């Protein structure tokens, strides 16, 4: 597929063949597939399929080099990995080949829980059950209270948002009933109006809060296990300035809870203090408030990305300064 194709249009084209993309950002209506590969990492589908850089998702790239005499390259999966999540720093992607999945008639299920411990525990049980999920989002009530009206009444409770295969709905209902949580089965996911559960998840959660108050921002992190210990310690210190939003993911094949907490902006120092606090509690923070690829990722230089930039963009003209390990 050409990299400028909107993911919305690509999904429609795949539907004709009974297929679907494995991973979507919450911005899938306006995002291009090339932009997602270059700057995305995961999203809807990560509870099944992990992250974009996991082997098996990106099968190949067509790339134009930024040289005095540009070359058109066809990169197989192994070579293409260096350009995956590199923010366009080491080659101009013109087309790509991705793995897809069999299409599933995902069912939207909302579960409300009276306390946070129950909500987190239920998410873990759902994610570890023998059911197919495409989304498992967990939101504290302070977020639910600020979601758009079409998302349903807030009820003052913490909420799970689930996309479940049809044969798994009864299992989710049974698990929820066992902890006295309230279940609403909304039916098959319809993505025509922009008001489905996926539009409440991942980065759209932050976008909805920013519609209320632009001082809300966010962080990204992988929580240490057991997750509640870390979350409770941070909540005690930061209070209402930190509101938890969790997404179930597969990390190297294992079920984990990633966190995209919304954070009230109190200045750069306060944000850095919070990041330091999270790290002290054992969380691995992927800081979205920094310039470089390395700073927002694992914090180390990726030698393969740098080597690809030297091959494809020796003068450093593509997205200059973004790849911290490169010097022309």
Regions flagged by a language model, labelled:
Residues 28, 181-328:
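Conserved glycine-rich FAD pyrophosphate-binding loop
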Residues 113, 127-186:
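A conserved active-site cap/scaffold subdomain adjacent to cofactor or substrate pockets
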Residues 1, 107-112, 152-174, 217-222, ...:
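Short cationic amphipathic helices and targeting signals
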Residues 7-8, 12-132, 136:
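FAD-binding subdomain of flavoenzyme oxidoreductases
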């Amino acid at each position: 597929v050409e990299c400028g194709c909107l993911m919305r249009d690509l999904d429609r084209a795949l539907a004709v063949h009974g297929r679907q993309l494995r991973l979507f950002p919450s911005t899938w209506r306006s995002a291009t597939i090339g932009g997602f590969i270059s700057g995305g990492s995961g999203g809807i589908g990560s509870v099944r399929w992990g992250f974009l850089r996991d082997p098996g998702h990106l099968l190949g790239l067509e790339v134009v080099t930024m040289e005095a005499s540009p070359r058109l390259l066809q990169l197989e999966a192994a070579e293409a990995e260096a350009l995956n999540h590199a923010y366009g720093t080491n080659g101009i992607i013109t087309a790509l080949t991705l793995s897809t999945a069999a299409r599933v008639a995902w069912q939207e299920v909302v579960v409300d829980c009276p306390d946070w411990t129950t909500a987190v525990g239920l998410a873990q049980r759902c994610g570890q059950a023998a059911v197919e999920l495409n989304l498992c989002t967990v939101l504290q009530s302070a977020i639910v209270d600020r979601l758009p009206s079409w998302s349903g009444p807030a009820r003052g409770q913490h909420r799970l948002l689930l996309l479940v295969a049809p044969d798994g709905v009864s299992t989710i209902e049974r698990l929820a009933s066992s902890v006295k949580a309230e279940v609403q089965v909304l039916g098959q996911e319809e993505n025509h109006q922009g008001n489905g559960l996926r539009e409440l998840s991942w980065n759209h959660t932050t976008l909805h809060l920013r519609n209320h108050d632009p001082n809300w921002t966010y962080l990204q992190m992988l929580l240490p296990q057991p997750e509640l210990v870390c979350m409770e310690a941070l909540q005690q210190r930061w209070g209402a300035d930190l509101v938890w939003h969790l997404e179930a993911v597969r990390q190297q094949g294992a079920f984990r809870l990633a966190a995209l907490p919304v954070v009230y902006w109190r200045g750069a120092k306060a944000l850095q203090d919070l990041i330091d606090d999270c790290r002290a509690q054992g969380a691995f923070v992927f800081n979205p408030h920094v310039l470089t690829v390395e700073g927002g990722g694992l914090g180390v230089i990726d030698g393969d990305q740098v080597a690809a930039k030297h091959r494809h963009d020796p003068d450093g003209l593509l997205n200059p300064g973004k790849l911290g390990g490169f010097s022309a």
